[in-house]
Amino acid sequence: MNKDQSKIPQATAKRLPLYYRFLKNLHASGKQRVSSAELSDAVKVDSATIRRDFSYFGALGKKGYGYNVDYLLSFFRKTLDQDETTNVILIGVGNLGTAFLHYNFTKNNNTKISMAFDVNQSKIGTEVGGVPVFDLNDLELHIKDEPVAILTVPAVAAQSITDRLVSLGIKGILNFTPARLNVPDHIRIHHIDLAVELQSLVYFLKHYSVLEEIE
């Protein structure tokens, strides 16, 4: 992403992979052009937001014609660095971590988990989903230039592990623990607490209708 594109709103940046995935499906089906209304219906983002998102990148479409699928796909592939592979490490090979290793982002050609770490001696030295599992105590011996880590460890251990990751040059952390981690300002961290998300969903189901949210 170039300097100008790095200034786009974070909400827009989060939607780009969603657009890219849908465009890949369109391309595979042989569709040559798509309207913002069709995109809106597919990705569940209103068409005005899609047009505004796309406007940050200049003229990507033509009024009355829509968007050329091949052009958009090529543009977003370059914007999202899809031709460069990002190696990710995973800390914690429990149930959730194991699921990640078996899945290993098979739909994302540019992202893969290259190694995992755990403290369980029965898992150390094995492979899960084709990914080698190393001793967490040897973390510093294995991390080279991997920029991203996924945390699926007990909350009590999350901060100390995070401190080690930061000292090793990790730039981004996907945190699946309930802990709210303290990191330096230059570190990007995304918290995903599945229990909180589920509780929030149940609350909205009980107290809000879908129509009320739309209004």
Swiss-Prot record:
Keywords assigned: Cytoplasm, DNA-binding, NAD, Repressor, Transcription, Transcription regulation
Keyword NAD: yes
DNA-binding region(s) from the entry: 18-57
SUPFAM superfamilies: NAD(P)-binding Rossmann-fold domains, Winged helix' DNA-binding domain
UniProt: NAD(+) binding residues: G92, V93, G94, N95, L96, G97
One Gene Ontology cellular component annotation held by this UniProt entry: cytoplasm
GO molecular function, one term: DNA-binding transcription factor activity
Location relative to the cell: Cytoplasm
Chief location category: cytoplasm
Organism domain of life: Bacteria
Function text: Modulates transcription in response to changes in cellular NADH/NAD(+) redox state.
Quaternary context: Homodimer.
Cross-referenced HAMAP family: Rex (MF_01131)
Family as reported in the entry's similarity comment: Belongs to the transcriptional regulatory Rex family.
Listed name of the protein: Redox-sensing transcriptional repressor Rex
The organism of origin for this protein: Bacillus velezensis (strain DSM 23117 / BGSC 10A6 / LMG 26770 / FZB42)
